[in-house]
Amino acid sequence: MRETSHGARDNVDVRLRRVGATSHTEREGTHDQGPKMTRVIAGAAGGRRLAVPPGTGTRPTSDRAREGLFSTWQSLLGGPLDGERVLDLYAGSGAVGLEALSRGASHTLLVEADARAARIVRENVRNLGLPGAEVRAGKAEQVIRTAPPAEPYDLVFLDPPYAVTDDDLREILLTLRSEGWLAEEALVTVERSTRGGEFRWPDGFEAIRSRRYGEGTFWYGRAASTCEDAR
């Protein structure tokens, strides 16, 4: 999982594909309000700015929450990111996936259903110039059913709009596992509204911990290994 170096890829791989259209960006009632910005916190692109899709629908993960996410990942991995493959579903501005590349991931797939938001993710990738990014425009549940990835993912982050139910997310997690998207013991993080109560993991996943950041809570889990399934 860690043998690929962060600098091993030569080109920024930005593939914008259309597979359908609900997303981290909720389009109803949104309108242009001028550019909003966030930033990469640390790593090779630390301090660089990222554009955020205009309007009120996108909920960028705050710096504090994002720092907490990567601190927890580092603790669970036993060290900094080093060549992991990262899947960022409901990518919004792409801040989490691009933060992962900046901190040492070898590849990030950023999936976003809203076409305008996906274009901004692509612009952020190009502006940062970090290798190893791939962008797909489409609904998460459709993208993960189109074809299995060339290689499975070690870290997965899901921050869907509030309209996506816990049952919807459990179905997506089961599909990720059955369709070969998850590496052995992949770490999976789900962000949900704090007011929604406890997130229950589906069969095949082990709950690890949770962390609250204001109105959102991160739920950390791990895909069970095939050895555990066989028991």
Task: Tell me the role of every PLM-derived stretch.
Residues 2-231:
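Class I S-adenosyl-L-methionine-dependent methyltransferase catalytic core
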